[in-house]
Amino acid sequence: MAEELGLGFGEGVPVEVLPEGCRHRPEARAGLAARSKACLALTCCLLSFPILAGLSTLLMAGQLRVPGKDCMLRAITEERSEPSPQQVYSPPRGKPRAHLTIKKQTPAPHLKNQLSALHWEHDLGMAFTKNGMKYINKSLVIPESGDYFIYSQITFRGTTSVCGDISRGRRPNKPDSITVVITKVADSYPEPARLLTGSKSVCEISNNWFQSLYLGAMFSLEEGDRLMVNVSDISLVDYTKEDKTFFGAFLL
């Protein structure tokens, strides 16, 4: 029987041979069919296991990739939302500047053709010094080289008696004009340099009078230069209000 089922192939396929007496029984054929179905089912299970395992692996890999993608997208979004260093706003560097207001002056003998330096308030009321600018010994000290705008307004006040004495030729230590000079003192120059000068006749007004002189211009200054304001007569300077007499400078 086995040789007959070889059907010419190189080797015969093993086939279960029923005993001679049971070859034609229906029960035997049914058992053989059931056994064949069981083998087929087992084979299908064995073949499907790798497929199911592969699908499970792919599914798990897909589930693991999702959080990674979310993290990547979140990182990219956060990176885009954060401004780059070039886009971060940085406030401009503070430039040196100062505004000084007049304070009551100490009386001093007035000498002809001699200009006296004024004292200033530097940290009260409207007065201030910022970003390196300093006020030392009647002078503004320049902290860094550059182009500065320098300004000053000096208000003088007088009476008719003074003007009357001057007009009649009597000069009781009183000038016939008022003069303001902004002076620069530098270590590189042996003498103070006059930057701005303003003058006004005192007796052009017949009554009690107030007269203001304003000076302002741009100058190139060096670090360490000192600026001061000199006047022809300190006793005529109006120190009653800080908006009448002031002095300042700032870097452009």
UniProtKB/Swiss-Prot annotation:
GO terms for biological process: immune response; positive regulation of canonical NF-kappaB signal transduction. Keywords: Cytokine, Disulfide bond, Glycoprotein, Membrane, Signal-anchor, Transmembrane, Transmembrane helix. Residues 61-252 are extracellular. Residues 1-39 are cytoplasmic. GO terms for molecular function: cytokine activity; tumor necrosis factor receptor binding. The chain crosses the membrane at residues 40-60. Disulfide bonds join 163-203. Belongs to the tumor necrosis factor family. Receptor for TNFRSF25 and TNFRSF6B. Mediates activation of NF-kappa-B. Inhibits vascular endothelial growth and angiogenesis (in vitro). Promotes activation of caspases and apoptosis. Promotes splenocyte alloactivation. This is Tumor necrosis factor ligand superfamily member 15. It comes from Mus musculus (Mouse). The lineage of its organism: Eukaryota, Metazoa, Chordata, Craniata, Vertebrata.
